[in-house]
């Protein structure tokens, strides 16, 4: 249960971090007619909404800042679709935090298992968080509603027919990408509600000849879906982001951090930075000299250079003054990315990078980062997770409220979801 509390804390951080962004403000404007009703809290406004609208908005907003958690083996962000949906449902029903946490565990388990067996081919064209996220939301909401097995099957199979999210949304500076988990949250929640009312689904939706697997994966391994079921929970094996950008940048950033800690490296003395990574790094994190925060978050050259110049790759690295930093700009031209076959072969189970920093005096410092800091095999401590949460939330809701939320979640003090939501809903805008 502690792992679920960590996930819920981290989701709150990502949600609040995205709440005062331009994208969130535009989304609130678009949903103006659906606000001021219902019982559910919405990030970015003090107005309430009905469950479906809250699920969509919070699912979107919690993905905007790129700080949400990851299930590495499935190239999937479970928190945004899963928690956003079941949180709205729990708040509308005045449910307990304990019940919410249990539902989260179920939603994470179902969706992460599906995400794992459809990779790596699924990720070539599809945003797993949008596609598989519908199952996380549907499973969590089905549990919270107390649906029986047949009803839960109907919910999952109905949700799966609405799975969507294309990788092309990553390839340009648009606001579409974060709406993928928002849509997944709304779809999954709606599927559970209609299943409760008796709407039936297609039982063989996953493995059918024209089903989810056939359409969205070259080699779905459904025979592996139930491997080790009951031995552990996948929510215990979640990656929590240590940097505020696309996770494909992380191995290189972490490798650079290792080298900076061990060697006297100054940016003005660097001749070249050579990065060996897996294919998704070059395909997704492709921007050089980014002009916007979005592009910067999907730029390997920028994030690596920002780590050297600024010391961290958190929110401040994506502000206007950082994007205009001439030292970062100059250093980007020294970053060379190549596809490393060893790193490619390990993807998606391991996200790795090989970094060499060559100095102007000819010395070369090298490090092979086998995993990301924050991955299950190198997890963030509770204190590191808390530090991240405080950094993201304190400027927006104040130090006192941030402290109370973290203490309630990590200290097992939170009881009612509505009471928990009150701590941020009137301040995250």
Report the location of each language-model feature.
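Hydrophobic alpha-helical hairpins/lids featuring a short glycine-rich hinge
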Residues: 61-116
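Secretory-pathway/luminal and periplasmic proteins that interact with or process carbohydrate-rich
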Residues: 18, 36-38, 110-118, 162-170, ...
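Acidic helix/loop microenvironments that form the catalytic cleft of cell-wall polysaccharide enzymes
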Residues: 156-164, 274-277
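Terminal-appendage/accessory-domain detector
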Residues: 1-75, 176-186, 193-429
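Active-site nucleophile and cofactor-binding loops and adjacent substrate-binding regions
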Residues: 74-80, 99-104, 122-134, 179-183, ...
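Extended, well-ordered alpha-helical scaffold segments
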Residues: 3, 30, 98-110, 150-158, ...
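Well-ordered alpha-helical segments within folded domains of soluble proteins
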Residues: 80-87, 133-140, 186-190, 249-251
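Active-site cavity-forming subdomains of large catalytic enzyme subunits
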Residues: 93-99, 116-125, 138-155, 166-178, ...
